[in-house]
UniProtKB/Swiss-Prot annotation:
Quaternary context: Part of the 50S ribosomal subunit. Contacts protein L29, and trigger factor when it is bound to the ribosome.
HAMAP family with a match to the protein in the record: Ribosomal_uL23_B
Protein name (Swiss-Prot/TrEMBL): Large ribosomal subunit protein uL23
SUPFAM superfamilies in the record: Ribosomal proteins S24e, L23 and L15e
Length: 96
């Protein structure tokens, strides 16, 4: 069980992801870089008790950032977009 919580790190909440939730019932999560689609699907079904129809993954590359004289990179991560069965939903925020 703890393995599943190590794979799924956090939900990604933006205006675009909220539109995906409303229109297509797709949820976006930040996941471990070593996770594959099958592991992500099993983890989400176990944690949230929903039927996941599909999982799309994408590696987000680090971006160069500069603040005054300081330069650096943001950290890269892997993101998963998961489609949930119709009629089911994942309660990400308590206010929804």
């Amino acid at each position: 069980m703890n393995k599943y919580y190590d794979l799924v790190k956090a939900p990604i909440i933006t205006e675009l992801t909220n539109k995906l939730i409303e229109r297509q019932n797709k949820y976006t999560f930040k996941v471990a870089k070593t996770a594959n689609k099958v592991e992500i699907k099993k983890a989400l079904e176990s944690i949230f008790q929903v039927k996941v129809l599909s999982v799309n993954t994408r590696n987000v590359l680090p971006q160069f950032k500069r603040k005054g004289k300081f330069e650096g990179y943001t950290s890269g991560y892997k993101k998963a977009i998961c489609k949930v069965a119709p009629g089911q939903k994942i309660e990400i925020l308590a206010n929804e």
